[in-house]
Every structure is written in structure tokens, then in C-alpha cells.
Amino acid sequence: GTLFVNGQIRRNASVLNGALTYKQADNSTVIINGSNAIPTRAKLEITNFGSIFNMSGTSTLRLIRGGGTSFGDLFLQAASNTVTGGTILCQQGGIGTPQTYSIDALVPIFNLTVDGSTALNTATARVINNPLTIKGALLINDDFSIFSGNGINVNILGNLVNNNSSNATGINAGGYQSGSVTQLTT
């Protein structure tokens, strides 16, 4: 089935404590639109003692809007996690403005896909604060899709598929951008 969330899945906006349990399995889809979001809270925020993040199967978590500030857009610092499958998809729905999706994850994710579609619908996934571990594949889908390591280490246990045909070179050019000369991608 599909769950459409117009806003965010997060803690109460007035406190930093609180815990959520997020479990997604099989071929389910969760779409977080991020409409009228509080920018100081992530679109999906799983953190604190007692929080759980589980993702498996061929499930898909799609983030439509970026723009989160304090905690980014995907803030995964769950106390407990089991990640054996699933894809996190940074793909807007034809909003008409480029979107940057900030990812701060202390827990691993399985697959990450960055999927823009036109110059007006460019999608950039950007790592913030903590090293990112991707247990499966990182897919940079097309010329309007960018992944930025932002100078933070990225560990990809599966494949890196970069379909961005840009011939630009450098730490801040092309489809995969390390962000610094000391950033480590393994």
C-alpha cells in the first residue's frame, strides 16, 4: 500500500525529546510531501532513546521537498535499527524549483536514489553532520540529479551508479560531488 503524508513525520516542534517508531516493509510506499513543513524539523525525524527505524523488502520512502535547516530533511539517529532493504528516493513531484535534500543518518540506509527530471526540477542529496553508510546502491539517476558528500565520508557497500553525464571534473562538479579533497568514499 501507499501512505501519503502531506507534512512531516517528526517529533513535536516545541521539544527536542520524544521518540518515534518507523517500520516499513515489503513493497510499501511512503511519500512525504513536506508541504508547509517546519524548516527547523526534518521531513522524517527518528531520534532519541526508545526510537526505532526499520526498513526492509522493496519498500520506498520518497521525499518530495527538501529545504530542512536544523535537522536536514532525513534525520535518522534511531536508538535501534534493522535495515535489510528498501529505497530512499529524493525525487520531487514537478514542483518547479530545484530541491536539496539534507541527510543526517547515524543508522545505515539500504538504497539511495537521487532523481531530478529537468533543470527546474533538479534534485541534490547532500550529506550533513555524520558519515553516511549505504548498504545497497547509490543511484544518481540523470543529468538533473546530484549527490554531494559535502566533505563527509560516505560508505557504499553496494554499487555507485552515476547516470549524470556531466563531463565536469572537480570536488564540486558532476553527478557525484565529494565536497572536499579529504572526503573518503569507500
Q: Model features per residue range: what roles?
A:
Residues G1-T186:
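Extracellular beta-sheet-rich ligand-binding/adhesion modules
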